[in-house]
C-alpha cells in the first residue's frame, strides 16, 4: 500500500529524518521531516500548464502552525486556528526567498508549497526543518527546479560557530543567522547579531553553507530512491524578430529616459516610451496585415532592455540612474520632534525615500503577549512598518499589513534590539511605528535610522545610534559592481541585494538575497566592506542632528516609580478579590504592575499621582515593629479593650488595662469608634498578632490633655 522511503543524516547535534511515500501521496511531492520531536510536513503541487496570458511566476509558500503540535487547543471563541501569525508569515517568506530564484526563467505554471507543523519540541524551531522539507518536496516532485537547497541556523557562542543551536543555546549566542543555498552558492541570509564584525558575519555564512551540504546530499539520496520523473518542459521559444523590432523602436527612448535623474519624471518618460513602442509596433503589424503583438510580451522585452541598459552603464563606470557613482549615499535630511504630542518622532529623508518614525512609551501592561507555538512570551519592544500606496505615487489597497510590510518591520526591529536598554534599567514598553511617506528604495533601512532617532528623541537610553543601508551588486562576465544605497529600480535589476544595519562597533542585522550563481566569498567581502563605509557615513549624519538620547522624557510620556516589597506582602496590596489595588488605581489614576518577586512599577503621566500611589503602597506593606509608636484608629470596642488599626491592614489589641494610668470601669468612657489614638506596639506573637499600649507612652489622659490645649486656645475670650 505504501512505498515509504526514509533517509537519515546527522545535522550538528541533531538527527534529521526525511520520509516520503506514506503521507499526502496525491501531492506532486510530499516529505515529512523529523528533528527530535519537531515534525513538519512539506508538500508541493504544480499546475500542469500555465494560465493563458500569464507573465509572471505564481509561486505561493504557506507555512502553517497547528496548535495540536504543542499539545494545545486554540484560544478564542471558535477554538480554531485563524489568520496567519507573524511567525508564520515570516517563516513563509524565509522559505520563499531561496526557492524562487531556482525555478527556470519562463516557467509560469502555478506552484504551491504548503508546510504544516505537526509536532513541536520547544527547543527545535520548525523553520529549518520546514525549509529542508520544502526543498526535498520540490526535488522529488519532478517539477522544473534547479535545486535542491539546504538551510542551516548558525549561532556564535564564545568565539565558536555552532550549527543548528537549540532555543536554550541561542540565548547565549551573539548571532542568530539563517543561511540557505545550493551545493555551489549561497542564496539567502537572514540574521541578527550583537554588533559583530563583517568578518565574523561572513564567516557564519560560509560555515552554514559548508555544513548544509549534509542536508543537500540526503535530499539527493531521497530523489534517487523516491523521485518522480522530471517534467518534459522547455521554455517558449523567444520571438527574435519581435525582440529586434522592440529594441529598434525603444533603444533611443529608453536611453533618454535613463538620463532623467528624478524618479517621477523618469517614470513618466518610461510610460511614454512604452506607449510609443506599442503604438509603433501595432502600426507596423497593421501595415503588414498582421495582429498587433501581445502587450505583455512587449512589456517583458522592454523590461529586459531596461535591465541590460542600466547594468551595462554601471559596469562601464557610467553614472547610476540618479547620477551618483557606486559608493555615494543619497543626500540625507533629519528633523526631530516632528509631532508635538508624540513621545518621540523623527522625519528621516534619504533622497526620494522618506520615513516618519514615531516612538511611544508605555507600561508593562502594554507589552505584547505572544501566544507562540513554542511557548507564550511577552515582548516589550514592537516595531510596525507601514507603506501606503501614495509613497510611490500610486493608488492601491489600504488594509491589514501585507507580508512585505511584516517582513520589513521585523528586519528593522532586529536591527534595533541589540542597542535597547535592559528591562531593569528602563522599564517602559516601546512601540516604534514607521510610516513610509516616500519610497524609492531602502525604506526598511530608513525605518532603522528613523527608529534609532525617534527613540533617542523620546529619551530611551539606547546604547548607540543604529543606521542601515541597502546595497546592490551586479555581476557579468567576471566584472562586478557594488552599489551603495540602491534605488527601487536598481533593486529589481541587480544580481544581489542585501541590507546591513549596525552601529559603529558592528553589525546588528544582515539580510541577503542572491539571484545568481557565481557570487564568491571574496565578492561578498568587498560588498560588506563597502556597506560599512556607507553605514558609517549615515551614522555621522545622524549624530549631527542628535548625538545621544535626550535626558528628559516627553511631558506626555508616563512617569514610572519602582519600589520593592516583601513578596509575602503582595496580597496586602492586591486585597480581597483585587479590591485594594483596584481602589488604588482608580483613586490615584495610575497603572500599577506587580511582579512575583515583589517589584512594583507605578506609572502615571502625573508624577504627583504616582508618588501618592507609592506612599499608599508603602503604608500598606510596611512592617509593624515592636517598640515603635503609631497613630492608630479605633476600629471597634470590646468589653475588655479595643481593636486599633496601626497601619492599613494591620491592627492589634489595646487591652483596657493598657489605656490609662487609672482604672477604667467602662471602655466607652474613654474611647469611641473612629477615634485617633497614639499607641505603642509592645508585643507581636509568632502569628503576627499585636499587643498595643497607650499607658506605655503616658496614658490616654495625657493625649486628651494635649488635645484640649489647642481647643481652649481657640475658645474666644468672654
Swiss-Prot record:
Its cofactor is Mg(2+). It comes from the Bacteria. Signal peptide: none annotated. The keyword Acyltransferase does not apply. One of its GO terms (molecular function) is magnesium ion binding. GO terms for cellular component: cytosol. It is found in: Cytoplasm. PROSITE patterns: KH_TYPE_1, S1. PANTHER family: POLYRIBONUCLEOTIDE NUCLEOTIDYLTRANSFERASE, POLYRIBONUCLEOTIDE NUCLEOTIDYLTRANSFERASE 1, MITOCHONDRIAL. This is Polyribonucleotide nucleotidyltransferase.
